[in-house]
Amino acid sequence: KEVWGEVQAGRFTIFVFASMLAYSAQDLILEPFVGLTFGWTVGETTALAGMQHGGMLLGMFAMAFSTYAFKSKTRHILHLWIKGGCVLSAICLALLATGGLIGGNAWPININVFVLGVANGSFAVAAIGGMMMLASEGRSQRDGLRMGLWGAAQAISFALGGFLGTVAVDVAGLWLENPAAAYGLVFFAEAALFVWASSLIFNLDQQ
């Protein structure tokens, strides 16, 4: 309760929950979405998931290299990666939704998913770095409590994300006759969540 009362810690907790919820909600629906909308086989969608993970790895390395190269501005660099990663993730998800409505081979789904992976990887690792940096700020002897609070927020959001993502698609599918539109609605919701999460980090920078 005392840690939650700290403005920075409380706001960062909400950021962690919101961003990781959006991050994990796409996990279980991306491959079925590509299979249904673009007519890809299971093998092709699995390969696409591998491409996304490759993008994530690239994003992680890019973020790590930039913080090493600009050690004197680590906090600023981390916040840039967090905000940029969230915004780019939102854009990629919105483009996925748009591509699903277009369908066919006209949409560069490979590039879209790869860039989404880069955005996800960079923001996720930067968020962990920001978490460790912010843990030492505020009242002393609460570092562990802050990390525990943020870790709990991350764990809960990860547990809920995959479940809520699939449920949301099913519910949207009952309302919308077009499966691509149902998936698109969920992707747009995730994009909005990423944008909101980014605004929370912006507010932290203003303090």
Question: Predicted segment positions?
Answer:
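Juxtamembrane intracellular "pre-TM" segments in multi-pass secondary transporters
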Residues: 1-13, 37
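Short amphipathic helix-loop junctions that connect adjacent transmembrane helices
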Residues: 28-47, 170
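C-terminal ends and interior cores of transmembrane alpha-helices
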Residues: 83-104
